[in-house]
């Protein structure tokens, strides 16, 4: 399935020298079928493909475009920074300014280190937890994604609660790496307590997406995040909240502010650079002082804290800190989700939505609640594929996977919301 012969030809050309024709697997449309859409430009709430077709965009470069694409203030900040030089490999005042902003907004972060991506941030946070505690095991949760580092590409495996070992989810990850990672069911407090009862004194840390945006969008049940905090305190393990996706999207203070839980370490992603390649990790001073050059845990990067990303992020936070910014986003998203739900109900299609700030999930199911990876797997993935292509055909861009969250930006207007709801009505009618 392809939108046009031109798109088909471009994908064929890309596949000649790029593995699978893409530089990140989800872009290949394997989750929905068909040929990827090649984008030429973006502005505000819209994307335009190489055929000139416009789409209302709910991917937002996978989250960071909270102000919409090509916001004039961000573009100006990047252009000004570029005129002064692209990268110095040396400190700038802009790194300090952005670090100050992040620490002020997220009080759990006393010291912060910039990286080049969310994967780098989570990878180093794991290394730091191990270095700080002198332990090897890490706990993660099924359905959560923390980047593509070896320690985190791991599933539960049959030996989890007998030998305390996980299994790789990717070829090339040594079994010796995976055995140190324990994968538990999301939102399962008894499993968490059982795991710590058996292996607690071997566990360096726990890492979790506070709102899981990689099994569509699953929120924590009451008490789940606090239960993690409690067992980490009891066993002196490091509690890592991965806010690469939720940070400054769910709320200004991140999901940790919404759920009133204080992690030891937090990881952040490209939103802190307004969408440019950047990440960060930070947290308690005592732990962060274990990072080189202060301590023995090594981390480095030539482009870490690069001036383009720093200055773009500083400019973005001026907008995010405006009164009522997040409330307006949330209200706009509520309109969208209510309209989509009404359209599905009218068509008699089992459908459910969930919202966390400016993030949302769409599920084809009659389940009352989606609280785990297993409940996500029980949704109708084939129905999502049909919905995705129906919406794409009508000019609405959703994530090309039933397992990815959606995002709204401050650029989405009432007209964009109505356009999307109308497209959904037509698509649902087609699916009946």
Swiss-Prot record:
Matches recorded under InterPro entries: 4pyrrol_synth_GluAld_NH2Trfase (IPR004639), Aminotrans_3 (IPR005814), Aminotrans_3_PPA_site (IPR049704), PyrdxlP-dep_Trfase (IPR015424), PyrdxlP-dep_Trfase_major (IPR015421), PyrdxlP-dep_Trfase_small (IPR015422)
PANTHER family recorded: GLUTAMATE-1-SEMIALDEHYDE 2,1-AMINOMUTASE, GLUTAMATE-1-SEMIALDEHYDE 2,1-AMINOMUTASE 1, CHLOROPLASTIC-RELATED
Protein name as catalogued: Glutamate-1-semialdehyde 2,1-aminomutase
Cysteine pairs bridged by disulfides in the record: none
Species of the source: Acinetobacter baumannii (strain SDF)
Modified residues (N6-(pyridoxal phosphate)lysine): 270
Broad enzyme group: isomerase
A Pfam short name: Aminotran_3
Pathway: Porphyrin-containing compound metabolism; protoporphyrin-IX biosynthesis; 5-aminolevulinate from L-glutamyl-tRNA(Glu): step 2/2
Subunit structure, as described in the record: Homodimer.
Lineage: Bacteria, Pseudomonadati, Pseudomonadota, Gammaproteobacteria, Moraxellales
Keyword Cytoplasm: yes
Family assignment from sequence similarity: Belongs to the class-III pyridoxal-phosphate-dependent aminotransferase family. HemL subfamily.
PROSITE patterns: AA_TRANSFER_CLASS_3
Required cofactor names: pyridoxal 5'-phosphate
Keywords: Cytoplasm, Isomerase, Porphyrin biosynthesis, Pyridoxal phosphate
EC number: 5.4.3.8
Any GO MF annotation of the entry: transaminase activity
Reaction(s) catalysed by this chain's protein: (S)-4-amino-5-oxopentanoate = 5-aminolevulinate
């Amino acid at each position: 399935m392809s939108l046009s012969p031109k798109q088909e030809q471009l994908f064929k050309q890309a596949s000649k020298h790029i593995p699978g024709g893409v530089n990140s697997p989800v872009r290949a449309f394997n989750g929905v079928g068909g040929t990827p859409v090649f984008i030429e430009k973006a502005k505000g709430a819209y994307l335009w493909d190489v055929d000139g077709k416009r789409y209302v965009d709910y991917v937002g470069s996978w989250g960071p475009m909270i102000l919409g694409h090509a916001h004039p203030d961000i573009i100006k900040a990047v252009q000004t920074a570029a005129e002064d030089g692209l990268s110095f490999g040396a400190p700038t005042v802009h790194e300090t300014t952005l670090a100050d902003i992040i620490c002020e907004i997220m009080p759990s972060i006393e010291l912060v280190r910039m990286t080049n991506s969310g994967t780098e941030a989570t990878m180093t946070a794991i290394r730091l937890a191990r270095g700080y505690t002198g332990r090897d095991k890490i706990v993660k949760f099924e359905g959560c994604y923390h980047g593509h580092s070896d320690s985190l590409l791991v599933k539960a495996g049959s030996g989890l609660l007998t030998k305390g070992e996980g299994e790789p989810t990717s070829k090339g990850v040594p079994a010796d790496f995976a055995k140190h990672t324990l994968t538990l069911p999301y939102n399962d407090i008894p499993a968490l307590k059982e795991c710590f009862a058996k292996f607690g004194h071997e566990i360096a840390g726990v890492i979790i997406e506070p709102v899981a945006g990689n099994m569509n969008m699953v929120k924590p049940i009451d008490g789940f995040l606090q239960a993690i905090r409690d067992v980490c305190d009891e066993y002196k393990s490091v509690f890592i909240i991965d806010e690469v996706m939720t940070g400054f999207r769910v709320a200004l203070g991140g999901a940790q502010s919404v759920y009133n839980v204080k992690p030891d370490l937090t990881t952040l992603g490209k939103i802190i650079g307004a969408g440019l390649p950047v990440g960060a990790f930070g947290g308690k001073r005592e732990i962060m002082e274990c990072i080189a050059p202060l301590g023995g845990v090594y981390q480095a990067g030539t482009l870490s804290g690069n001036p383009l990303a720093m200055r773009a992020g500083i400019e973005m936070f001026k907008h995010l800190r405006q009164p009522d910014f997040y409330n307006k986003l949330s209200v706009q998203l509520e309109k969208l989700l209510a309209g989509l739900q009404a359209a599905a109900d009218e068509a008699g299609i089992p459908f459910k939505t969930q919202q966390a700030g400016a993030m949302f999930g769409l599920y084809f199911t009659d389940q009352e609640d989606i609280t785990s990876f297993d409940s996500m797997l029980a949704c109708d993935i084939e129905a999502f594929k049909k919905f995705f292509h129906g919406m794409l055909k009508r000019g609405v861009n959703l994530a090309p996977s039933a397992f990815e969250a959606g995002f709204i930006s401050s650029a989405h207007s009432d007209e964009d919301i109505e356009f999307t709801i109308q497209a959904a009505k037509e698509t649902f009618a087609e699916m009946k």
